[in-house]
Structure formats: structure tokens, C-alpha cells
Amino acid sequence: MRSLAVVVAVVATVAMAIGTAHGSVSSIISHAQFDRMLLHRNDGACQAKGFYTYDAFVAAANAFPGFGATGSTDARKRDVAAFLAQTSHETTGGWATAPDGAFAWGYCFKQERGAAADYCTPSAQWPCAPGKRYYGRGPIQLSHNYNYGPAGRAIGVDLLRNPDLVATDPTVSFKTALWFWMTAQAPKPSSHAVITGKWSPSGADRAAGRAPGFGVITNIINGGLECGHGQDSRVADRIGFYKRYCDILGVGYGDNLDCYNQRPFA
């Protein structure tokens, strides 16, 4: 979301549970698997060293009971793998020849590097607080006041007045990313609904090449910049994280992993 094209803010209901929910996310991903996925997040070179913890992730996930708990065991695993993959791309510190590979370096950053803008768009509904800046923070790199406002309302924290909480409180940080993951912003479905098979594409979606799968989630997050123009290294990076995490959780990838030939959402 660091480079996310402008998302129209809507007050959407967080999808707290879609379909049949089962248990805690800790039954899907163990502490050891979390550490294996995000192998170098606590490396000394990482800005977010010590910030993103398994306990904070589980605590945040427990506030969204549908996450990692909807549908079959495979659907639940893909939900977790896809969430951690997309957010790993947003926070990556990896490079092509990095130790253990580029896809072992997710969650290296907790806030946008070199942010110069305040990301404040005039809004009566989500007014910017004096002196506050709404640059990318947290796993999804939440940005703009019109995202901080509804995210904060959904999780019960005033993020318009306290945006720095997304980079100082790890549970709040994960909650903002999960809010984005679980919440539809029309005409876009929620990422959660897509990866768990609860989204049915419309005729317009099908005409735009948008079929259920991981690729549509990339389109939701940053389709305006990454989708619909053939091969894109950023899309490939997201897929690389996803495949690695699916392998760790022991689940297949599903279909339609890229968005190379998908038109972005309007």
C-alpha cells in the first residue's frame, strides 16, 4: 500500500466473519512457522527489528474472527499465507542475492522510507489533525487520512490524531493491515473474500480478466500501477512471497496468481 493508487474512502463494514469460522489463527500458523516465514525481520539492518511479533499478530487476528478461520483448512491457510505475502512485499528489505533469498526478508520496515508528503486530502469526514502526517506505516503501509480514519474507527483507536501508533504499537499495526484485508471498498471486494473463495466476479470483472485468485488481491492493493500491462517485477515479488509461505504451511497456491492481464478496478 506504500505505492497504492488512491483508494476512495468508504465506511465499509469489517468482515468480521465470512462463511464458517473456526478457532484462532494460531491453529493455522505456529510461532515457528511465523518465524520461518519472516526469517530476517529482526535483522540488525531492518528498521522494524523487534517490532513485529507473533503474539501481536495473533492478538490482532483475534479481533477479526473470520481471518484464517473461514472455509476449508486449505482456504484458511491461503488466507494467512496471502496476507503475510502481500504485506511482506510492502515491507520487504530483501534483494535478489539476499541471504536465504529475497523472500525471507518480509516485515523489515514499519514505516515508509523518506516520506516527504503528509498524505492529507481535505475531508469533512476524515479531517487531518494539525501537524499529523499519514504516510505509509505498518504491514500494509497504511497511508492517507481517508484510510487512517476508517481503520481507526473500526479498531477503536483515533488514528487521525495518533497515526504514529501504527508504527509504535505492534498490535494496532497488525490490526490496521487486517482491517484493510477484511474490508471491501466498492467496487473492490475484500482480499479475504477473494482468497477464501467467497467472492464471485461480476460480468464486468470477468470482462476485465479478474478471476478469483491471488492476482486479484494484488489488483485490489496496487492494481493501478502493477496490473494490466504484462509482466511486472512487483507482481512477481508478491507471488514469490506467497509461494514460499504456502509451501511452509503445506497448501497449494490455487489458480490465477498474477494480474498481468487484468484491468485495474475503476
UniProtKB/Swiss-Prot annotation:
Pfam families hit by this protein: Glyco_hydro_19
Residue spans crossing the bilayer: none
Thermal activity profile: Enzyme activity is retained almost fully under 40 degrees Celsius and completely destroyed at 70 degrees Celsius. At 60 degrees Celsius the activity was 15-30% compared to the untreated enzyme.
Impact noted for substituting residue 118 to A: Chitinase activity is reduced to 79% of wild-type. Decreased anti-fungal activity
Highest taxon in the source lineage: Eukaryota
First-tier enzyme category under EC: hydrolase
Effect of mutating residue 95 to A: Chitinase activity is reduced to 51.2% of wild-type. Decreased anti-fungal activity
Record GO biological process: cell wall macromolecule catabolic process; chitin catabolic process; defense response to fungus; killing of cells of another organism; polysaccharide catabolic process
Record-annotated site: May be involved in substrate-binding: 95, 118
Presence of keyword Hydrolase: yes
Organism classification: Eukaryota, Viridiplantae, Streptophyta, Embryophyta, Tracheophyta
Similarity-based family: Belongs to the glycosyl hydrolase 19 family. Chitinase class II subfamily.
Organism name: Secale cereale (Rye)
EC number(s) recorded for this UniProt protein: 3.2.1.14
Protein name as catalogued: Basic endochitinase C
Matches recorded under PROSITE patterns: CHITINASE_19_1, CHITINASE_19_2
